[in-house]
A protein has these predicted regions:
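Flexible metal-binding regulatory segments at protein termini and peripheral loops
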Residues: 2-6, 19-170
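Hydrophobic h-region of N-terminal signal peptides that target proteins for export
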Residues: 9-18
Length: 170
C-alpha cells in the first residue's frame, strides 16, 4: 500500500511539473551579460518563477506553475526597465509610463534599464529619432535622467518600448 501511495504522489508531482506554463517576451533590450544579470535580479523575488534571458535573441522566457506567477515576473521586468511583447495574450506587459501625451520641454525618466554604455547608446539612438528631443543626461547606472527639447512625452515612451526598454515619467 505504501508503494502505491508513493507511486501516486510521484506521478502527481511529475504531472504538476509538466503542467508548468512558459511565456516568452520578445524584442527585449538585452545587449550584454549585465542585462542578462539585470533580468535575473529583476525577477529574483518572484517565488516559483524561472527566467531565462537570451541576449542573442532579445528574449526572456518565463516559466512557472501558473500565469499569476508569470504575470508577476513580467511586472517585475517592466519595473526594472525592460519591455517586450508577450507570446501569451493572458500575460500583459504593462505599457503605463505616466506620460500624458502632451508636448513638454523637459521630462525626468525613472527606472529605465541603463546597466552599461550600450544601454546608454540605445537610449541615445531612440531619442535621436523622437521629433523635438534635443538632449538627455542618460548615463550608465543612472536611476533617472532628464530629456530636453520640445517633444511629446508619450512619443518618447512609445519609442523606448519599441526598442525593448521602458521607464516611468517622474
Amino acid at each position: 500500500m505504501k508503494i502505491i501511495v508513493t507511486s501516486i504522489a510521484l506521478a502527481l508531482a511529475i504531472a504538476a511539473r509538466a503542467a508548468d506554463t512558459t511565456v516568452t517576451l520578445t524584442d527585449v533590450h538585452i545587449c550584454c551579460p549585465s542585462c542578462v544579470k539585470g533580468v535575473a535580479t529583476a525577477v529574483a523575488d518572484v517565488k516559483g518563477l524561472t527566467a531565462k534571458a537570451d541576449q542573442d535573441a532579445g528574449t526572456v522566457t518565463l516559466t512557472a506553475a501558473d500565469t499569476t506567477t508569470i504575470q508577476k515576473g513580467a511586472d517585475a521586468l517592466v519595473a526594472a526597465g525592460f519591455f517586450g511583447k508577450s507570446s501569451d495574450a493572458a500575460i500583459k506587459v504593462n505599457a503605463a509610463t505616466g506620460a500624458k501625451d502632451k508636448t513638454v520641454e523637459s521630462m525626468t525618466v525613472e527606472n529605465l534599464h541603463l546597466c552599461c554604455g550600450k544601454c546608454v547608446t540605445a537610449v541615445n539612438n531612440v531619442l535621436g529619432n523622437v521629433p523635438g528631443v534635443t538632449g538627455n543626461t542618460a548615463a550608465k547606472g543612472a536611476k533617472s535622467f532628464e530629456i530636453t527639447g520640445n517633444f511629446n512625452d508619450k512619443d518618447v515612451f512609445d519609442a523606448f518600448q519599441k526598442a525593448g526598454l521602458t521607464g516611468q515619467e517622474k
